């Protein structure tokens, strides 16, 4: 039976002439038809030939290949995004594996560092502390009324690069690009926001080109009052928004999430998204080895909000697999710069306190050190899994990895710190130090490793496997909150799509070319769980799937019809 493709309805717009060509969400460039050129006063403003979007994308791809550095490629792609968003997303989807590291990690890190230098055109909303009493007016200036997803940062902890001030805006822009490219959320529904509360980066304060508020960061009550004013303004403007907190400093990330997750539909991708993709990866890796995650001993290097968030989700998963909470917590060991977190360690943050090991249980350990180092922990715990979220390069030393491999034939090693310059160890070294026996997953993209004439593909434990599907699921289901169970359902769905589990070979995570399929599946699982949890209206499975399909935007041009303002 012949399949009939339903043509998208015409779009009625009031803009014409040069104004239309300057509107990135509506501009088609050389793809405006002859009729549209007449109707919208575009005759003579474009070359004669009417092109298809694929012809435009092919030209853009050829131009892209002419740039030699990743930052120049990033600037070029951002220019297309600010000129013709539909073409931008068609190009990115056509070359996702090539371009994802350019529009997001690791290249976005350099773009944030050089934000004021490479700035060309405004995108998103910049809310500075001196303008804190004008937030309602600022948000009213946003031309898109139907915003459904906001990614917001204050620029204080950008990847592993620290305080980038207003340059942190590169992260929400890049993140929302992936919401669209991977999760099918229309760019018309997205809004990047930076809260400009100053910067403590002296290099930026001394930079004559720096475009942010030249002031040390506000803190404490002033800071939290400012963020609260922003949250209330967002709720007033877009009551049903999905708000993602991104790259806030450790001291603020967890308090903000705790404070607002039950007030507005929100989540923190650094804490919850990273945890969800990591747990999904570990579930898949454990199943591929014929075991369960609850049978593994896990050591973390890095006990910040991200590391502790991952640990808590691992504990929740192993409880689902049958462990008691106490037994689940005894399997997880957190190491930070002061050593293993124990019940005798002072000045722990509240989210760290639940993840300590009891010193009474460590009496038999083979060590004479008062401060238990990562090597001490690996030697005594004999872990199956080693996870790095320290933001410091080179801390997974050869001695540590070889010690781990001595007791674990197939170690799982996950140096997750971003960007690549901050990774705890390179996949090449880990593969060599374990004689080719380690399963490696990284936070940033790495090329396959060749060791002793064998090719080892390296899985990227990328949050983009998770957050676009969560966003799509929330929008499609109308969920009012994001619960822990919704995040767990995303992890489980990701694990079910593992080629290593399903085929007995290949990567532990799906290929990036399949990420839209994965995002759709996660959206359904998240939406279904939202209904079960009572944070979304219950519908049939068919209705939920239809809502996902209806909300899945594709980078295709629609016919335009003229209307009055």
UniProtKB/Swiss-Prot annotation:
The keyword Nucleus does not apply. GO terms for molecular function: malate dehydrogenase (decarboxylating) (NAD+) activity; metal ion binding; NAD binding; oxaloacetate decarboxylase activity. The active site is at 104 (proton donor), 175 (proton acceptor). Divalent metal cations. Prefers magnesium or manganese. Keywords: Metal-binding, NAD, Oxidoreductase. The record marks 270 as: Important for activity. A divalent metal cation binds at residues 246-247, 270. It comes from the Bacteria. Its EC number is 1.1.1.38. It catalyses: (S)-malate + NAD(+) = pyruvate + CO2 + NADH; oxaloacetate + H(+) = pyruvate + CO2. Its cofactor is Mg(2+); Mn(2+). Pfam families: malic (PF00390), Malic_M (PF03949). Signal peptide: none annotated. Coiled coil: none annotated. NAD(+) binds at residues 157, 270, 418. GO terms for biological process: malate metabolic process. GO terms for cellular component: cytosol. Belongs to the malic enzymes family. Homotetramer. This is NAD-dependent malic enzyme. It comes from Salmonella gallinarum (strain 287/91 / NCTC 13346).
